[in-house]
Amino acid sequence: MNNFVSTNLLEQQKPIPGMDLFLKRSKSISPITEIIEEIRQGRMVVLLDDEDRENEGDLVMAAQYVTPEDINFMSKHGRGLICLTLTEERGKQLNLSPMVARNGTKMGTNFTASIEAAEGVTTGISAADRAHTIQTAVHVNARPMDIVSPGHVFPLIAQKGGVLVRAGHTEAGCDIAKLAKLDASAVICEILKDNGEMARLPDLLDFAAKHDLKVGTIADLINYRSQTESLVKRVAERLIETAYGPFQLIAYQESIANQTHLALVKGNITADKSVLVRVHEPLSVLDLLDASNKSHSWSLPDAMQMISQADAGVIVMLRRDEKSEDVIHAINSANFPANNQYTLKDYGIGAQILRDLGVVKMRLMAEPRKMPSMAGFGLQVTEFL
């Protein structure tokens, strides 16, 4: 986190819009190492997600340490939905099923059926009952028979790879607990204002100061993990000749889905220059055949042609298992644009490939959209094309 502010700016007579908030934020955000230590000590923190995502803050603490007093604090002061973040492995251990067959939420939050401890609770809603349910679910030897559904605790299943794949509080809760060398589970609760509206950055900083809680960001957590971890690895590369000139073709192996993604690179990528970037997802065989396909904002041929005319550029092609029915559907609906809604998983994997290629500033060949937690990967979008 860069806390430096030019003294020349501070000495100007006219107030700078947003400067007070910037200074307050810089002083209020704790290093992620301090946030991890707070979690390790069983204390609660406020964790902020990206302003380009949900733009919210959650109370977060390690699930194994939760007490009735903690649940009561979240209920009284946080006011949001109290949830239990779990890894996919823990969800399988408890035999948790998805809340719905098709997740239609904007952020794809992975709710399971709500749960209750099978024994040791009364109505299930009291702070003591919910704390007991959580402790039951995260016990190292927890069994499916130890919980029942429905209940008053709402489990969320984190995606494999954590915040390097999905920049959400669900993944952040599990990641921070794991980094603190605790059970990889957390209790989280959104923070609302007194009037019931979502608390935003200024409100969240005031809230944390009032309750003496440390504040961290998911972007800093992403940055912390990405310093030593990556979910993609270069496995092959060579120079190829295309109809648009020579490109360096690089293959990346993704460890989560065991997919091989491709990158086409032209020229020298440097951190100080804003380079053309196209992230193409999902890559279909039809993208290489049908020049009239309008399911993407940029076709592969158009993107390659534009980059061929520039000094440098990158095309990242993210592959997914393309089943027979997918190909048939694509042929039948070729004239209809796709919804163009990237998943957060695609952002995370694509961002790690771009980071490996040395991209920092990019002129993104895509329709303008919010780009969650790109700062955590050290990436900056300077322009949409």
Where are these regions (language model features)?
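Catalytic domains of riboflavin
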Residues: 1-385
